[in-house]
Amino acid sequence: MASAAVANYEEEIVRPVADFSPSLWGDQFLSFSIKNQVAEKYAKEIEALKEQTRNMLLATGMKLADTLNLIDTIERLGISYHFEKEIDDILDQIYNQNSNCNDLCTSALQFRLLRQHGFNISPEIFSKFQDENGKFKESLASDVLGLLNLYEASHVRTHADDILEDALAFSTIHLESAAPHLKSPLREQVTHALEQCLHKGVPRVETRFFISSIYDKEQSKNNVLLRFAKLDFNLLQMLHKQELAQVSRWWKDLDFVTTLPYARDRVVECYFWALGVYFEPQYSQARVMLVKTISMISIVDDTFDAYGTVKELEAYTDAIQRWDINEIDRLPDYMKISYKAILDLYKDYEKELSSAGRSHIVCHAIERMKEVVRNYNVESTWFIEGYTPPVSEYLSNALATTTYYYLATTSYLGMKSATEQDFEWLSKNPKILEASVIICRVIDDTATYEVEKSRGQIATGIECCMRDYGISTKEAMAKFQNMAETAWKDINEGLLRPTPVSTEFLTPILNLARIVEVTYIHNLDGYTHPEKVLKPHIINLLVDSIKI
Protein backbone atom coordinates (compact mmCIF):
# COMPACT_ATOMS: atom_id res chain seq x y z
CA MET A 1 0.00 0.00 0.00
CA ALA A 2 1.19 3.45 -0.87
CA SER A 3 2.54 5.99 1.52
CA ALA A 4 0.80 9.29 2.10
CA ALA A 5 1.70 12.60 0.64
CA VAL A 6 1.44 15.85 2.52
CA ALA A 7 -1.72 17.90 2.16
CA ASN A 8 0.01 21.01 0.92
CA TYR A 9 2.15 20.25 -2.11
CA GLU A 10 3.81 23.64 -1.97
CA GLU A 11 5.54 22.55 1.22
CA GLU A 12 8.46 20.19 1.26
CA ILE A 13 7.26 16.66 0.56
CA VAL A 14 7.77 14.27 3.43
CA ARG A 15 8.25 10.71 2.27
CA PRO A 16 8.03 8.01 4.95
CA VAL A 17 10.59 5.86 3.18
CA ALA A 18 10.83 2.24 4.29
CA ASP A 19 14.26 1.30 5.56
CA PHE A 20 14.96 -1.70 3.33
CA SER A 21 18.21 -3.55 3.84
CA PRO A 22 20.69 -3.66 0.94
CA SER A 23 21.24 -6.73 -1.20
CA LEU A 24 22.97 -9.61 0.55
CA TRP A 25 24.86 -10.53 -2.58
CA GLY A 26 26.63 -7.47 -3.98
CA ASP A 27 28.21 -8.34 -7.35
CA GLN A 28 28.66 -12.00 -6.43
CA PHE A 29 26.59 -13.31 -9.34
CA LEU A 30 27.64 -10.73 -11.92
CA SER A 31 29.92 -12.98 -13.92
CA PHE A 32 29.75 -16.69 -14.62
CA SER A 33 30.71 -18.73 -17.63
CA ILE A 34 30.02 -22.40 -18.14
CA LYS A 35 33.12 -24.56 -18.38
CA ASN A 36 32.29 -26.28 -21.63
CA GLN A 37 34.55 -29.29 -21.11
CA VAL A 38 32.98 -30.04 -17.71
CA ALA A 39 29.46 -29.49 -19.04
CA GLU A 40 30.06 -31.76 -22.03
CA LYS A 41 31.53 -34.45 -19.79
CA TYR A 42 28.50 -34.27 -17.46
CA ALA A 43 26.04 -34.29 -20.37
CA LYS A 44 27.66 -37.34 -21.95
CA GLU A 45 27.53 -39.35 -18.72
CA ILE A 46 23.97 -38.19 -18.05
CA GLU A 47 22.85 -39.63 -21.40
CA ALA A 48 24.19 -43.06 -20.41
CA LEU A 49 22.64 -42.86 -16.93
CA LYS A 50 19.36 -41.71 -18.45
CA GLU A 51 19.19 -44.86 -20.54
CA GLN A 52 19.90 -47.05 -17.50
CA THR A 53 17.18 -45.25 -15.55
CA ARG A 54 14.69 -45.62 -18.39
CA ASN A 55 15.39 -49.34 -18.43
CA MET A 56 14.65 -49.49 -14.69
CA LEU A 57 11.33 -47.74 -15.24
CA LEU A 58 10.30 -49.98 -18.10
CA ALA A 59 11.41 -53.25 -16.49
CA THR A 60 8.65 -55.84 -16.41
CA GLY A 61 7.51 -57.92 -13.47
CA MET A 62 8.13 -55.27 -10.82
CA LYS A 63 5.99 -55.23 -7.70
CA LEU A 64 3.65 -52.28 -7.34
CA ALA A 65 5.51 -50.99 -4.28
CA ASP A 66 8.86 -51.13 -6.10
CA THR A 67 7.47 -49.28 -9.13
CA LEU A 68 5.94 -46.54 -6.99
CA ASN A 69 9.09 -46.14 -4.92
CA LEU A 70 11.22 -45.89 -8.06
CA ILE A 71 8.98 -43.16 -9.50
CA ASP A 72 8.92 -41.32 -6.18
CA THR A 73 12.71 -41.48 -5.89
CA ILE A 74 13.22 -40.25 -9.47
CA GLU A 75 10.83 -37.35 -8.82
CA ARG A 76 12.40 -36.40 -5.50
CA LEU A 77 15.87 -36.51 -7.09
CA GLY A 78 14.72 -33.93 -9.63
CA ILE A 79 15.32 -36.04 -12.74
CA SER A 80 11.73 -36.98 -13.60
CA TYR A 81 11.53 -34.27 -16.29
CA HIS A 82 13.60 -36.62 -18.46
CA PHE A 83 10.90 -39.31 -18.22
CA GLU A 84 7.55 -37.51 -18.19
CA LYS A 85 5.89 -39.77 -20.76
CA GLU A 86 7.22 -43.01 -19.28
CA ILE A 87 6.09 -42.07 -15.76
CA ASP A 88 2.68 -40.90 -16.96
CA ASP A 89 2.13 -44.13 -18.90
CA ILE A 90 3.06 -46.27 -15.88
CA LEU A 91 0.77 -44.33 -13.53
CA ASP A 92 -2.03 -44.43 -16.09
CA GLN A 93 -1.70 -48.21 -16.17
CA ILE A 94 -1.69 -48.43 -12.35
CA TYR A 95 -4.77 -46.20 -12.16
CA ASN A 96 -6.73 -48.13 -14.79
CA GLN A 97 -5.82 -51.50 -13.28
CA ASN A 98 -7.23 -50.22 -9.99
CA SER A 99 -4.14 -51.71 -8.35
CA ASN A 100 -4.66 -52.37 -4.67
CA CYS A 101 -2.26 -52.87 -1.79
CA ASN A 102 -2.62 -53.66 1.87
CA ASP A 103 0.19 -51.71 3.53
CA LEU A 104 -0.18 -48.06 4.47
CA CYS A 105 3.14 -46.97 2.97
CA THR A 106 2.35 -48.21 -0.55
CA SER A 107 -1.31 -47.14 -0.43
CA ALA A 108 -0.43 -43.59 0.59
CA LEU A 109 2.38 -43.32 -1.95
CA GLN A 110 0.10 -44.62 -4.70
CA PHE A 111 -2.58 -42.09 -3.74
CA ARG A 112 -0.21 -39.10 -3.69
CA LEU A 113 1.59 -39.92 -6.92
CA LEU A 114 -1.63 -40.53 -8.82
CA ARG A 115 -3.25 -37.35 -7.50
CA GLN A 116 -0.16 -35.26 -8.26
CA HIS A 117 -0.29 -36.56 -11.83
CA GLY A 118 -3.97 -35.69 -12.21
CA PHE A 119 -5.55 -39.11 -11.63
CA ASN A 120 -8.61 -38.82 -9.39
CA ILE A 121 -8.01 -41.89 -7.25
CA SER A 122 -10.60 -42.34 -4.50
CA PRO A 123 -9.60 -41.63 -0.87
CA GLU A 124 -11.46 -44.83 0.00
CA ILE A 125 -8.08 -46.50 -0.44
CA PHE A 126 -7.48 -45.46 3.20
CA SER A 127 -10.70 -46.87 4.70
CA LYS A 128 -9.02 -50.24 5.32
CA PHE A 129 -6.75 -48.50 7.81
CA GLN A 130 -9.63 -47.24 9.94
CA ASP A 131 -11.39 -48.95 12.83
CA GLU A 132 -15.13 -49.46 13.27
CA ASN A 133 -15.45 -45.88 14.57
CA GLY A 134 -13.89 -44.39 11.45
CA LYS A 135 -10.63 -43.52 13.22
CA PHE A 136 -7.19 -44.50 11.97
CA LYS A 137 -6.01 -47.62 13.79
CA GLU A 138 -3.59 -46.92 16.63
CA SER A 139 -1.57 -49.95 15.53
CA LEU A 140 -0.33 -47.79 12.64
CA ALA A 141 1.54 -45.54 15.08
CA SER A 142 4.68 -47.69 14.85
CA ASP A 143 4.75 -47.63 11.02
CA VAL A 144 6.81 -44.46 10.60
CA LEU A 145 7.33 -44.79 6.84
CA GLY A 146 3.63 -45.45 6.42
CA LEU A 147 2.77 -42.41 8.54
CA LEU A 148 5.22 -40.25 6.59
CA ASN A 149 3.63 -41.24 3.30
CA LEU A 150 0.15 -40.73 4.76
CA TYR A 151 1.19 -37.27 5.94
CA GLU A 152 2.53 -36.34 2.49
CA ALA A 153 -0.59 -37.77 0.82
CA SER A 154 -2.89 -35.70 3.02
CA HIS A 155 -1.62 -32.49 1.41
CA VAL A 156 -3.05 -33.34 -2.02
CA ARG A 157 -6.57 -33.50 -0.56
CA THR A 158 -9.57 -31.82 -2.17
CA HIS A 159 -12.87 -30.65 -0.69
CA ALA A 160 -14.39 -34.13 -0.85
CA ASP A 161 -11.53 -35.86 0.99
CA ASP A 162 -12.70 -35.69 4.61
CA ILE A 163 -10.75 -38.83 5.47
CA LEU A 164 -7.52 -36.98 4.63
CA GLU A 165 -8.27 -34.28 7.20
CA ASP A 166 -8.16 -37.07 9.79
CA ALA A 167 -5.08 -38.52 8.09
CA LEU A 168 -3.21 -35.23 8.45
CA ALA A 169 -4.03 -34.88 12.15
CA PHE A 170 -3.29 -38.54 12.91
CA SER A 171 0.01 -38.70 11.02
CA THR A 172 1.23 -35.34 12.35
CA ILE A 173 0.71 -36.28 16.00
CA HIS A 174 2.48 -39.62 15.68
CA LEU A 175 5.34 -38.32 13.51
CA GLU A 176 6.05 -35.50 15.97
CA SER A 177 6.15 -38.06 18.75
CA ALA A 178 8.39 -40.47 16.83
CA ALA A 179 10.84 -38.00 15.24
CA PRO A 180 13.29 -37.55 18.16
CA HIS A 181 13.76 -41.32 18.46
CA LEU A 182 14.41 -42.11 14.79
CA LYS A 183 17.75 -42.95 13.21
CA SER A 184 19.36 -40.83 10.51
CA PRO A 185 18.44 -40.12 7.71
CA LEU A 186 14.78 -40.99 8.45
CA ARG A 187 14.83 -38.58 11.38
CA GLU A 188 15.90 -35.70 9.13
CA GLN A 189 13.32 -36.65 6.52
CA VAL A 190 10.46 -36.70 9.03
CA THR A 191 11.59 -33.46 10.71
CA HIS A 192 11.88 -31.73 7.35
CA ALA A 193 8.47 -32.98 6.19
CA LEU A 194 6.79 -31.65 9.33
CA GLU A 195 8.43 -28.30 8.64
CA GLN A 196 7.77 -28.32 4.89
CA CYS A 197 5.52 -30.90 3.26
CA LEU A 198 6.64 -32.09 -0.17
CA HIS A 199 3.57 -30.98 -2.13
CA LYS A 200 3.84 -27.35 -1.00
CA GLY A 201 7.62 -27.13 -1.30
CA VAL A 202 9.63 -25.50 -4.09
CA PRO A 203 10.77 -28.42 -6.30
CA ARG A 204 14.46 -27.41 -6.61
CA VAL A 205 14.74 -26.75 -2.88
CA GLU A 206 13.21 -30.14 -2.10
CA THR A 207 15.46 -31.86 -4.65
CA ARG A 208 18.65 -30.38 -3.20
CA PHE A 209 17.61 -31.40 0.32
CA PHE A 210 16.67 -34.93 -0.74
CA ILE A 211 19.89 -35.57 -2.68
CA SER A 212 22.30 -34.26 -0.05
CA SER A 213 20.55 -34.86 3.26
CA ILE A 214 18.52 -38.01 2.65
CA TYR A 215 19.26 -40.19 -0.37
CA ASP A 216 23.04 -39.87 -0.21
CA LYS A 217 22.88 -41.28 3.34
CA GLU A 218 20.46 -44.13 2.67
CA GLN A 219 21.95 -47.61 2.84
CA SER A 220 19.56 -48.88 0.17
CA LYS A 221 20.29 -46.09 -2.32
CA ASN A 222 20.63 -46.80 -6.02
CA ASN A 223 24.03 -45.42 -7.04
CA VAL A 224 23.02 -45.00 -10.68
CA LEU A 225 20.12 -42.75 -9.70
CA LEU A 226 22.21 -40.87 -7.15
CA ARG A 227 25.03 -40.10 -9.59
CA PHE A 228 22.53 -39.18 -12.30
CA ALA A 229 20.81 -36.75 -9.90
CA LYS A 230 24.05 -35.13 -8.75
CA LEU A 231 25.38 -34.65 -12.28
CA ASP A 232 22.04 -33.36 -13.53
CA PHE A 233 21.67 -30.93 -10.63
CA ASN A 234 25.16 -29.52 -11.16
CA LEU A 235 24.72 -29.26 -14.93
CA LEU A 236 21.43 -27.41 -14.53
CA GLN A 237 22.99 -25.22 -11.85
CA MET A 238 25.57 -24.06 -14.42
CA LEU A 239 22.73 -22.93 -16.69
CA HIS A 240 20.93 -21.24 -13.80
CA LYS A 241 24.08 -19.39 -12.73
CA GLN A 242 24.65 -18.26 -16.31
CA GLU A 243 21.08 -16.91 -16.46
CA LEU A 244 21.48 -15.15 -13.11
CA ALA A 245 24.72 -13.54 -14.32
CA GLN A 246 22.91 -12.29 -17.43
CA VAL A 247 20.06 -10.85 -15.36
CA SER A 248 22.47 -9.37 -12.79
CA ARG A 249 24.31 -7.46 -15.53
CA TRP A 250 20.99 -6.16 -16.88
CA TRP A 251 20.03 -5.05 -13.36
CA LYS A 252 23.39 -3.38 -12.73
CA ASP A 253 23.14 -1.48 -16.02
CA LEU A 254 19.72 -0.13 -14.97
CA ASP A 255 21.43 1.19 -11.81
CA PHE A 256 18.23 1.42 -9.77
CA VAL A 257 20.29 0.97 -6.61
CA THR A 258 21.67 4.46 -7.20
CA THR A 259 18.78 6.20 -8.95
CA LEU A 260 15.89 4.66 -6.97
CA PRO A 261 17.48 4.00 -3.56
CA TYR A 262 14.10 3.77 -1.80
CA ALA A 263 13.34 0.42 -3.46
CA ARG A 264 14.36 -3.10 -2.52
CA ASP A 265 17.41 -4.46 -4.35
CA ARG A 266 16.33 -8.09 -4.69
CA VAL A 267 17.20 -9.30 -8.18
CA VAL A 268 18.79 -12.52 -6.82
CA GLU A 269 15.69 -13.30 -4.76
CA CYS A 270 13.57 -12.55 -7.84
CA TYR A 271 15.61 -15.10 -9.76
CA PHE A 272 14.91 -17.64 -7.00
CA TRP A 273 11.19 -17.04 -7.57
CA ALA A 274 11.54 -17.57 -11.32
CA LEU A 275 13.57 -20.72 -10.69
CA GLY A 276 10.77 -21.88 -8.41
CA VAL A 277 8.26 -21.53 -11.23
CA TYR A 278 10.28 -23.72 -13.60
CA PHE A 279 13.83 -25.07 -13.39
CA GLU A 280 14.01 -27.23 -16.52
CA PRO A 281 16.45 -26.25 -19.31
CA GLN A 282 13.76 -25.72 -21.95
CA TYR A 283 12.38 -22.80 -19.91
CA SER A 284 15.59 -20.77 -19.89
CA GLN A 285 14.14 -17.92 -21.94
CA ALA A 286 10.95 -17.99 -19.87
CA ARG A 287 12.91 -17.75 -16.61
CA VAL A 288 14.92 -14.75 -17.75
CA MET A 289 11.78 -12.93 -18.89
CA LEU A 290 9.99 -13.76 -15.65
CA VAL A 291 12.81 -12.65 -13.34
CA LYS A 292 13.10 -9.32 -15.16
CA THR A 293 9.36 -8.83 -14.77
CA ILE A 294 9.38 -9.68 -11.05
CA SER A 295 12.32 -7.33 -10.47
CA MET A 296 10.58 -4.50 -12.29
CA ILE A 297 7.20 -4.86 -10.58
CA SER A 298 9.01 -4.94 -7.24
CA ILE A 299 10.33 -1.43 -8.02
CA VAL A 300 6.80 -0.28 -8.91
CA ASP A 301 5.44 -1.84 -5.71
CA ASP A 302 7.96 0.05 -3.58
CA THR A 303 7.21 3.28 -5.44
CA PHE A 304 3.57 2.98 -4.39
CA ASP A 305 4.28 1.44 -1.03
CA ALA A 306 7.10 3.52 0.32
CA TYR A 307 7.80 6.64 -1.67
CA GLY A 308 5.29 8.19 -4.08
CA THR A 309 2.89 11.02 -3.26
CA VAL A 310 -0.79 10.95 -4.21
CA LYS A 311 -0.40 13.26 -7.21
CA GLU A 312 2.72 11.44 -8.40
CA LEU A 313 1.09 8.03 -8.12
CA GLU A 314 -2.03 9.16 -9.96
CA ALA A 315 0.14 10.51 -12.78
CA TYR A 316 2.17 7.29 -12.86
CA THR A 317 -0.98 5.16 -12.92
CA ASP A 318 -2.38 7.20 -15.80
CA ALA A 319 0.90 6.97 -17.72
CA ILE A 320 1.01 3.18 -17.34
CA GLN A 321 -2.58 2.92 -18.61
CA ARG A 322 -1.70 4.98 -21.68
CA TRP A 323 1.51 2.97 -22.26
CA ASP A 324 3.12 5.68 -24.35
CA ILE A 325 6.66 7.03 -24.00
CA ASN A 326 5.31 10.51 -24.79
CA GLU A 327 3.62 10.45 -21.37
CA ILE A 328 7.00 10.47 -19.64
CA ASP A 329 7.24 14.27 -19.45
CA ARG A 330 4.21 14.35 -17.14
CA LEU A 331 6.13 12.38 -14.51
CA PRO A 332 8.60 13.53 -11.86
CA ASP A 333 12.21 12.71 -12.70
CA TYR A 334 12.53 9.66 -10.46
CA MET A 335 9.39 8.07 -11.98
CA LYS A 336 10.68 8.62 -15.51
CA ILE A 337 13.46 6.13 -14.76
CA SER A 338 11.23 3.14 -14.03
CA TYR A 339 8.58 4.16 -16.60
CA LYS A 340 11.10 4.16 -19.45
CA ALA A 341 12.68 0.93 -18.18
CA ILE A 342 9.29 -0.80 -18.18
CA LEU A 343 8.38 0.27 -21.71
CA ASP A 344 11.86 -0.67 -22.94
CA LEU A 345 11.56 -4.09 -21.32
CA TYR A 346 8.34 -4.90 -23.14
CA LYS A 347 9.79 -3.70 -26.44
CA ASP A 348 12.62 -6.16 -25.80
CA TYR A 349 10.10 -8.93 -25.11
CA GLU A 350 8.28 -8.21 -28.38
CA LYS A 351 11.55 -8.22 -30.30
CA GLU A 352 12.70 -11.41 -28.60
CA LEU A 353 9.47 -13.25 -29.41
CA SER A 354 9.07 -11.89 -32.94
CA SER A 355 11.45 -14.45 -34.47
CA ALA A 356 9.00 -17.18 -33.46
CA GLY A 357 5.99 -15.11 -34.57
CA ARG A 358 4.83 -14.70 -30.97
CA SER A 359 5.28 -10.98 -30.29
CA HIS A 360 1.49 -10.48 -30.26
CA ILE A 361 1.15 -12.36 -26.94
CA VAL A 362 3.07 -9.69 -25.00
CA CYS A 363 -0.11 -7.59 -24.85
CA HIS A 364 -1.59 -10.07 -22.34
CA ALA A 365 1.17 -9.35 -19.84
CA ILE A 366 0.93 -5.59 -20.44
CA GLU A 367 -2.79 -5.60 -19.65
CA ARG A 368 -2.14 -7.52 -16.44
CA MET A 369 0.49 -4.99 -15.44
CA LYS A 370 -1.92 -2.13 -16.03
CA GLU A 371 -4.38 -3.90 -13.72
CA VAL A 372 -1.77 -4.24 -10.96
CA VAL A 373 -0.90 -0.54 -11.12
CA ARG A 374 -4.56 0.55 -11.09
CA ASN A 375 -5.10 -1.52 -7.96
CA TYR A 376 -1.89 -0.26 -6.33
CA ASN A 377 -3.33 3.21 -6.79
CA VAL A 378 -6.61 2.25 -5.11
CA GLU A 379 -4.63 1.01 -2.10
CA SER A 380 -2.70 4.27 -1.98
CA THR A 381 -5.98 6.20 -1.95
CA TRP A 382 -7.30 4.07 0.91
CA PHE A 383 -4.14 4.81 2.86
CA ILE A 384 -4.41 8.56 2.33
CA GLU A 385 -8.07 8.63 3.27
CA GLY A 386 -7.60 6.37 6.29
CA TYR A 387 -10.23 4.05 4.83
CA THR A 388 -10.57 0.46 6.05
CA PRO A 389 -12.72 -1.38 3.48
CA PRO A 390 -14.86 -4.47 4.13
CA VAL A 391 -12.93 -7.70 3.52
CA SER A 392 -14.79 -8.38 0.28
CA GLU A 393 -13.89 -4.95 -1.12
CA TYR A 394 -10.33 -5.30 0.12
CA LEU A 395 -9.86 -8.67 -1.57
CA SER A 396 -11.48 -7.60 -4.84
CA ASN A 397 -8.66 -5.07 -5.14
CA ALA A 398 -5.84 -6.79 -3.24
CA LEU A 399 -5.85 -10.05 -5.19
CA ALA A 400 -4.44 -8.24 -8.22
CA THR A 401 -1.80 -6.47 -6.13
CA THR A 402 -0.27 -9.82 -5.21
CA THR A 403 0.98 -9.56 -8.84
CA TYR A 404 0.17 -13.26 -9.25
CA TYR A 405 -2.34 -12.80 -12.11
CA TYR A 406 0.38 -10.77 -13.78
CA LEU A 407 3.23 -13.18 -13.02
CA ALA A 408 1.24 -16.25 -14.10
CA THR A 409 0.52 -14.53 -17.42
CA THR A 410 4.16 -13.48 -17.76
CA SER A 411 5.32 -17.03 -17.01
CA TYR A 412 3.65 -18.14 -20.27
CA LEU A 413 5.48 -15.60 -22.46
CA GLY A 414 8.68 -17.60 -22.78
CA MET A 415 6.95 -20.99 -22.88
CA LYS A 416 7.24 -21.77 -26.56
CA SER A 417 4.15 -23.99 -26.70
CA ALA A 418 1.81 -21.42 -25.11
CA THR A 419 -0.94 -20.50 -27.57
CA GLU A 420 -3.41 -17.63 -27.75
CA GLN A 421 -6.00 -20.06 -26.36
CA ASP A 422 -3.86 -20.67 -23.26
CA PHE A 423 -3.64 -16.92 -22.63
CA GLU A 424 -7.39 -16.56 -23.18
CA TRP A 425 -8.06 -19.28 -20.62
CA LEU A 426 -5.75 -17.57 -18.13
CA SER A 427 -7.32 -14.15 -18.73
CA LYS A 428 -10.65 -15.45 -17.37
CA ASN A 429 -9.08 -16.06 -13.93
CA PRO A 430 -9.80 -19.81 -13.74
CA LYS A 431 -10.37 -21.27 -10.29
CA ILE A 432 -6.87 -22.76 -9.99
CA LEU A 433 -5.31 -19.35 -10.72
CA GLU A 434 -7.70 -17.61 -8.33
CA ALA A 435 -6.67 -20.12 -5.64
CA SER A 436 -2.95 -19.48 -6.16
CA VAL A 437 -3.58 -15.73 -5.94
CA ILE A 438 -5.61 -16.12 -2.72
CA ILE A 439 -2.81 -18.17 -1.15
CA CYS A 440 -0.32 -15.44 -1.98
CA ARG A 441 -2.59 -12.70 -0.64
CA VAL A 442 -3.49 -14.23 2.72
CA ILE A 443 -0.01 -15.61 3.47
CA ASP A 444 1.65 -12.32 2.52
CA ASP A 445 -0.87 -10.33 4.58
CA THR A 446 -0.33 -12.50 7.63
CA ALA A 447 3.47 -12.32 7.42
CA THR A 448 3.66 -8.57 6.81
CA TYR A 449 0.86 -7.43 9.15
CA GLU A 450 2.98 -6.22 12.06
CA VAL A 451 5.39 -4.27 9.84
CA GLU A 452 2.58 -2.65 7.85
CA LYS A 453 0.76 -1.78 11.08
CA SER A 454 3.91 -0.12 12.45
CA ARG A 455 4.05 2.00 9.27
CA GLY A 456 0.50 3.24 9.88
CA GLN A 457 -1.21 1.19 7.19
CA ILE A 458 -4.74 0.43 8.36
CA ALA A 459 -6.28 -1.05 5.21
CA THR A 460 -4.39 -4.34 5.58
CA GLY A 461 -6.13 -7.65 5.07
CA ILE A 462 -5.85 -8.64 8.71
CA GLU A 463 -7.10 -5.23 9.89
CA CYS A 464 -10.08 -5.37 7.50
CA CYS A 465 -10.91 -8.88 8.70
CA MET A 466 -10.70 -7.90 12.37
CA ARG A 467 -12.98 -4.93 11.84
CA ASP A 468 -15.46 -6.78 9.62
CA TYR A 469 -15.96 -9.72 11.96
CA GLY A 470 -15.18 -8.07 15.29
CA ILE A 471 -12.41 -10.54 16.01
CA SER A 472 -8.87 -10.49 17.40
CA THR A 473 -5.63 -10.44 15.40
CA LYS A 474 -5.06 -14.11 16.20
CA GLU A 475 -8.57 -15.05 15.05
CA ALA A 476 -8.18 -13.02 11.85
CA MET A 477 -4.89 -14.77 11.08
CA ALA A 478 -6.55 -18.16 11.69
CA LYS A 479 -9.33 -17.15 9.30
CA PHE A 480 -6.76 -16.25 6.64
CA GLN A 481 -4.98 -19.57 7.22
CA ASN A 482 -8.28 -21.37 6.62
CA MET A 483 -8.69 -19.42 3.38
CA ALA A 484 -5.26 -20.66 2.30
CA GLU A 485 -6.16 -24.28 3.12
CA THR A 486 -9.39 -23.97 1.13
CA ALA A 487 -7.48 -22.48 -1.79
CA TRP A 488 -5.00 -25.38 -1.72
CA LYS A 489 -7.93 -27.77 -2.10
CA ASP A 490 -9.06 -25.75 -5.11
CA ILE A 491 -5.58 -26.03 -6.62
CA ASN A 492 -5.52 -29.77 -6.02
CA GLU A 493 -8.93 -30.12 -7.69
CA GLY A 494 -7.74 -27.99 -10.60
CA LEU A 495 -4.89 -30.42 -11.28
CA LEU A 496 -7.24 -33.40 -11.72
CA ARG A 497 -8.06 -34.68 -15.19
CA PRO A 498 -9.64 -33.70 -17.48
CA THR A 499 -8.00 -30.28 -17.39
CA PRO A 500 -8.81 -27.33 -19.70
CA VAL A 501 -5.13 -26.81 -20.56
CA SER A 502 -2.14 -29.13 -20.45
CA THR A 503 -0.31 -29.84 -17.20
CA GLU A 504 2.60 -27.78 -18.52
CA PHE A 505 0.49 -24.64 -18.06
CA LEU A 506 -0.97 -25.63 -14.70
CA THR A 507 2.43 -26.28 -13.11
CA PRO A 508 3.60 -22.62 -13.03
CA ILE A 509 0.36 -21.69 -11.22
CA LEU A 510 0.93 -24.48 -8.69
CA ASN A 511 4.57 -23.46 -8.27
CA LEU A 512 3.69 -19.81 -7.63
CA ALA A 513 1.62 -20.97 -4.65
CA ARG A 514 4.53 -23.12 -3.48
CA ILE A 515 6.96 -20.20 -3.67
CA VAL A 516 4.87 -18.00 -1.41
CA GLU A 517 4.52 -20.84 1.12
CA VAL A 518 8.31 -21.14 1.27
CA THR A 519 9.14 -17.43 1.16
CA TYR A 520 6.77 -16.53 3.99
CA ILE A 521 7.22 -19.67 6.12
CA HIS A 522 6.64 -19.14 9.87
CA ASN A 523 5.06 -15.74 9.08
CA LEU A 524 8.44 -14.31 8.06
CA ASP A 525 8.77 -11.93 5.11
CA GLY A 526 11.54 -13.79 3.33
CA TYR A 527 11.55 -11.45 0.34
CA THR A 528 12.06 -8.19 2.23
CA HIS A 529 14.36 -9.92 4.74
CA PRO A 530 15.97 -12.74 2.70
CA GLU A 531 18.59 -13.49 5.34
CA LYS A 532 15.85 -15.10 7.43
CA VAL A 533 14.52 -17.55 4.86
CA LEU A 534 15.78 -17.40 1.29
CA LYS A 535 19.53 -17.01 1.81
CA PRO A 536 20.22 -20.70 2.60
CA HIS A 537 18.03 -21.79 -0.33
CA ILE A 538 19.86 -19.45 -2.71
CA ILE A 539 23.23 -20.73 -1.49
CA ASN A 540 22.12 -24.33 -2.00
CA LEU A 541 20.71 -23.71 -5.47
CA LEU A 542 22.98 -21.03 -6.91
CA VAL A 543 26.27 -21.00 -5.00
CA ASP A 544 27.24 -24.48 -3.80
CA SER A 545 27.33 -27.37 -6.23
CA ILE A 546 26.82 -30.94 -5.03
CA LYS A 547 29.98 -32.91 -4.35
CA ILE A 548 30.23 -35.88 -6.68
Curated annotation (Swiss-Prot):
Query: Would I find DNA damage among this entry's keywords?
Result: no
- Fill in the PTM field for this protein: Self-alkylated at Tyr-520 in the presence of (2Z,6E)-farnesyl diphosphate ((Z,E)-FPP). Self-alkylated at Asp-444 at warm temperature (42 degrees Celsius) in the presence of (2E,6E)-farnesyl diphosphate ((E,E)-FPP).
Q: Which residues bind Mg(2+) 3?
A: 444-445, 448, 452
Protein name from the UniProt record: 5-epi-aristolochene synthase
**EC number(s) for this protein?**
4.2.3.61, 4.2.3.226, 4.2.3.227
Q: In which pathway does it act?
A: Secondary metabolite biosynthesis; terpenoid biosynthesis
Organism listed in the record: Nicotiana tabacum (Common tobacco)
Supply the enzyme class, top level: lyase
Q: Which family does it belong to?
A: Belongs to the terpene synthase family.
Note the effect listed for residue 277 to L: Catalyzes the conversion of (2E,6E)-farnesyl diphosphate to (+)-5-epi-aristolochene and triggers self-alkyation of D-444 leading to enzyme inactivation
Q: What up-regulates or down-regulates this gene?
A: By fungal elicitor.
Substituting residue 407 to I results in: Catalyzes the conversion of (2E,6E)-farnesyl diphosphate to (+)-5-epi-aristolochene and triggers self-alkyation of D-444 and Y-520 leading to enzyme inactivation
Task: Write down the chemical reaction(s) this protein catalyses.
Answer: (2E,6E)-farnesyl diphosphate = (+)-5-epi-aristolochene + diphosphate; (2Z,6E)-farnesyl diphosphate = (+)-2-epi-prezizaene + diphosphate; (2Z,6E)-farnesyl diphosphate = (-)-alpha-cedrene + diphosphate; (2Z,6E)-farnesyl diphosphate = (-)-beta-curcumene + diphosphate
Task: Tell me the cofactors it needs.
Answer: Mg(2+)
Q: What is any Pfam family matched here? A: Terpene_synth_C
In the UniProt entry, what is the domain comment? The Asp-Asp-Xaa-Xaa-Asp/Glu (DDXXD/E) motif is important for the catalytic activity, presumably through binding to Mg(2+).
Give the activity regulation note: Inhibited activity toward farnesyl diphosphate (FPP) by anilinogeranyl diphosphate (AGPP); AGPP undergoes a cyclization event leading to the formation of a novel macrocyclic paracyclophane alkaloid. Repressed by sesquilavandulyl diphosphate (SPP) via the induction of self-alkyation.
Q: How does it assemble?
A: Monomer.
Query: Main localization of the protein?
Result: cytoplasm
Question: Mutating residue 372 to I has which effect?
Answer: Relaxed product specificity leading to equal amounts production of 5-epi-aristolochene, 4-epi-eremophilene and premnaspirodiene with cis,trans-farnesyl diphosphate as substrate
Sequence positions that bind Mg(2+) 1: 301, 305
One GO BP annotation of this record: diterpenoid biosynthetic process
Tell me the compartments it is located in: Cytoplasm
Q: Mind listing the GO molecular function terms for this protein?
A: 5-epi-aristolochene synthase activity; magnesium ion binding; terpene synthase activity
Any one GO CC term of the record: cytoplasm
